[in-house]
Amino acid sequence: MATNFNDIVKQGYVKMKSRKLGIYRRCWLVFRKSSSKGPQRLEKYPDEKSVCLRGCPKVTEISNVKCVTRLPKETKRQAVAIIFTDDSARTFTCDSELEAEEWYKTLSVECLGSRLNDISLGEPDLLAPGVQCEQTDRFNVFLLPCPNLDVYGECKLQITHENIYLWDIHNPRVKLVSWPLCSLRRYGRDATRFTFEAGRMCDAGEGLYTFQTQEGEQIYQRVHSATLAIAEQHKRVLLEMEKNVRLLNKGTEHYSYPCTPTAMLPRSAYWHHITGSQNIAEASSYGESYGAAQASSETDLLNRFILLKPKPSQEDSSEAKTPAQ
């Protein structure tokens, strides 16, 4: 967990090739890694002072990179090129051969995850490919301070079919905290944040958890799909139990459940709003649900984005008697 996280990987003066005119112009180039503030990108400023003044840079998102290469000296001296999968390229030259080599190695490792054949890089990490593959399923978030946790700051969020995990931004193998999806009472997002309320089932404790992120919509869709899958599993288990009870007690007046389900079932009293919301999600538009002004507190934000609770039917009323947390 990084409270003073710096997303700048490398920066310096270079001569960037113009896409329109094809000429090289001197600029201050900043390479930023992906974070809660945005994706991995190159930012081009007129000079170094413009960064401190927070001017509006020209941004090139570094995604879908095919390769990073050095141009031959006879073509362009001290030049580095980033080739994208659509065969477009961004090319720049450096003031020295040493600087060009540093840019090349940094971009290769950060954009491609490649381990260059250099003794200075040390022994290859055999687990690196698996870790990097898993990293693609993690989102960049900034956990805001909350009374239930001692940690806050920049981290990685991962959603599996059962849990939400937070991982350390510097060491992808260090798990910071986790929440079972079946402990979620409600969740929502806006343009810059993702928020959920967890019950007492989780180790982190009951409360609101808010994350600043540019990927709130993607996180929301992952969480919603996973919770719907758990709810469907819950429904199937209950139907199977009811079927078994009827078969075992056929012809008798007394009904009793023969055993408890083997699958972990959600125990939250708020759980039934998730299954019912699937039917009403298409009826309400995104603008109607999320077009209101930004809430003044985290609770107002969450209440504004909560999945709407459907009107209980006679059949649902029996399921709603699940013991509360």
From Swiss-Prot:
Domain notes from UniProt: PTB domain mediates receptor interaction.
Residue span, PH domain: 7-112
Gene assigned in the entry: Dok4
Domain of life: Eukaryota
Protein family per UniProt: Belongs to the DOK family. Type B subfamily.
Entry protein name: Docking protein 4
GO biological process assignments: cell surface receptor protein tyrosine kinase signaling pathway; nervous system development; positive regulation of MAPK cascade
Chain span(s) of sequence motif DKFBH motif: 265-275
One Pfam family, short name: IRS
Ranges where the IRS-type PTB domain occurs: 132-237
Main function: DOK proteins are enzymatically inert adaptor or scaffolding proteins. They provide a docking platform for the assembly of multimolecular signaling complexes. DOK4 functions in RET-mediated neurite outgrowth and plays a positive role in activation of the MAP kinase pathway. Putative link with downstream effectors of RET in neuronal differentiation. May be involved in the regulation of the immune response induced by T-cells.
Statement: the UniProt record of this protein carries the keyword Phosphoprotein: yes
